[in-house]
UniProtKB/Swiss-Prot annotation:
UniProt keywords, alphabetically: ATP-binding, Kinase, Nucleotide-binding, Phosphoprotein, Transferase
Catalytic reactions on record: adenosine 5'-phosphosulfate + ATP = 3'-phosphoadenylyl sulfate + ADP + H(+)
InterPro entries (alphabetical): APS_kinase (IPR002891), P-loop_NTPase (IPR027417)
GO terms of biological process kind: hydrogen sulfide biosynthetic process; sulfate assimilation
Protein species of origin: Erwinia tasmaniensis (strain DSM 17950 / CFBP 7177 / CIP 109463 / NCPPB 4357 / Et1/99)
Record-stated family: Belongs to the APS kinase family.
Transmembrane residue ranges: none
EC primary class: transferase
Function: Catalyzes the synthesis of activated sulfate.
Entry binding sites for ATP: 35-42
Pfam families per the UniProt record, alphabetical: APS_kinase
Pathway: Sulfur metabolism; hydrogen sulfide biosynthesis; sulfite from sulfate: step 2/3
Record protein name field: Adenylyl-sulfate kinase
């Protein structure tokens, strides 16, 4: 990784985050969806994005698979590459929050250290860790991409939940039961956003 160049300095923008938030009528923040593959992260995040759009809230969904088609296309699934994947997404999310958006990110992000890294990037009150807690057996039964089947057959190595560890969040900002209806989980998230004064009541 390249070292920071002392000749590269931060350039302050004339329009502040607060001014953008005032214009849009809501605060910028990241909801970081974490959980096993097949837990429902992308499904719940997508439902929340639709709900926010209907409420007139400017939002954007960063999906774990989608970013690997572009921003992170050069990365694999080693521990170092996973960390860099999360770092890049965290930096993009931080820029989006500065633009006043509500950012939804759906990533397995199996390690607590990487999730904490992004929390530290965002600062107090801007990072909401959403743990989509779905039992491994349920995730494996769903297996929407056929990845568990490949992992069990030894065709896919370093797969989270099978031969790579998933570190359960110890202090998630919201703990969702991934076996509940998506509509119910979406309501829970909207209630949280209102309670934290990110969107209007």
């Amino acid at each position: 990784m390249a070292q920071h160049d002392e000749n590269v300095v931060w350039h302050a923008h004339p329009v502040t985050r607060e001014a953008r938030e005032h214009l849009q009528g809501h605060r910028g923040a990241v909801l970081w969806f974490t959980g096993l593959s097949g837990s429902g992260k992308s499904t719940v995040a997508g439902a929340l994005e639709q709900a926010l759009h209907q409420l007139g809230v400017s939002s954007y969904l960063l999906d774990g698979d989608n970013v690997r088609h572009g921003l992170c296309r050069d990365l694999g699934f080693s521990d170092d590459d996973r960390k860099e994947n999360i770092r890049r997404v965290g930096e993009v999310a931080r820029l989006m929050v500065d633009a006043g958006l509500v950012v939804l990110t759906a990533f397995i992000s199996p390690h607590r250290a990487e999730r904490q890294m992004v929390r530290d990037m965002l600062g107090e009150g801007r990072f909401i860790e959403v743990f989509v807690d779905t039992p491994l057996a349920i995730c494996e039964a769903r297996d929407p991409k056929g990845l568990y089947k490949k992992a069990r057959a030894g065709e896919l190595r370093n797969f989270t939940g099978i031969d790579a560890e998933y570190q359960v969040p110890l202090h998630a900002d919201i703990h969702l039961d991934g076996e509940q209806l998506v509509t119910h989980l979406t309501r829970q998230l909207l209630d949280l956003l209102r309670q934290q004064d990110i969107i209007k009541p």
